[in-house]
From Swiss-Prot:
Molecular function as annotated in GO: 2-hydroxy-3-oxopropionate reductase activity; NAD binding; NADP binding
Residues annotated to bind NAD(+): 4-18, 94, 237
Keywords for the protein's UniProt record, in alphabetical order: NAD, Oxidoreductase
Protein name (record): 2-hydroxy-3-oxopropionate reductase
EC code(s) of this entry: 1.1.1.60
PROSITE patterns hit by this protein: 3_HYDROXYISOBUT_DH
InterPro entries reported in the protein's UniProt record: 3-OH-isobutyrate_DH-rel_CS, 6-PGluconate_DH-like_C_sf, 6PGD_dom2, 6PGDH_NADP-bd, HIBADH-like_NADP-bd, HIBADH-related, NAD(P)-bd_dom_sf, Tartro_sem_red
Domain of life: Bacteria
Gene3D superfamilies, alphabetized: N-(1-d-carboxylethyl)-l-norvaline Dehydrogenase, domain 2, NAD(P)-binding Rossmann-like Domain
Induction summary: By glyoxylate.
Organism: Escherichia coli (strain K12)
Known pathway: Organic acid metabolism; glycolate degradation; 3-phospho-D-glycerate from glycolate: step 3/4
Family to which this protein belongs: Belongs to the HIBADH-related family.
Chemical reaction(s) catalysed: (R)-glycerate + NADP(+) = 2-hydroxy-3-oxopropanoate + NADPH + H(+); (R)-glycerate + NAD(+) = 2-hydroxy-3-oxopropanoate + NADH + H(+)
Amino acid sequence: MKLGFIGLGIMGTPMAINLARAGHQLHVTTIGPVADELLSLGAVSVETARQVTEASDIIFIMVPDTPQVEEVLFGENGCTKASLKGKTIVDMSSISPIETKRFARQVNELGGDYLDAPVSGGEIGAREGTLSIMVGGDEAVFERVKPLFELLGKNITLVGGNGDGQTCKVANQIIVALNIEAVSEALLFASKAGADPVRVRQALMGGFASSRILEVHGERMIKRTFNPGFKIALHQKDLNLALQSAKALALNLPNTATCQELFNTCAANGGSQLDHSALVQALELMANHKLA
């Protein structure tokens, strides 16, 4: 099957590699250089999203935010400048659910199919092919693309119609942010009280407080390893989507708003490109105490 992939960053590169390893011919485009491993697997690098679309049956998009997806789709050399008849656009970025519905409608009007399929699992999940994939769109289109999703992830769910995948991802990001904040508070509390955070985390991992966030991000906080698997700047973007959507729904998300303020503090102190586990640094600043 002829596939296209647009956006080869921290997540997109390993995802595209997994598709290429399965024997699929890929045409790709990205802002920076294409990884040598991907080229060695036969991927063809082209200049524009239009060229990717012309050469492909199914086109995957993995870019940072809503404006970038809109440019990829509808820009001067975007996907929609090629014929979309018989083609499927699969947007795996994390973007606005409201705009996603508009994008899907416009692609459908031009004869193409559209799935929104944001992911969770970070760089590790992308590399290992264990992502959780939350899909919005037509069931028949989902079933057609599902074998490709299975090369990228393990927990693959058709949530509902177009936009529902993105809504699910926003909910996911709320939960992840609040859990990172909770782990940060707990370990910082233990550390300032004089306990060893390494041993506290070890004890908590055996009880009801155990979680993937405590396992992975708790370790990063203790070891001070904040190289980005998922950048604070991107989580700020996701929580902005949550808060904007909540406002439209006349819904209060008080703890989400608090987490966003903590991410904003990190960003204001030069941490926007750090891993989101570095949220702990905002709490450390207020406590005048480093966890480790």
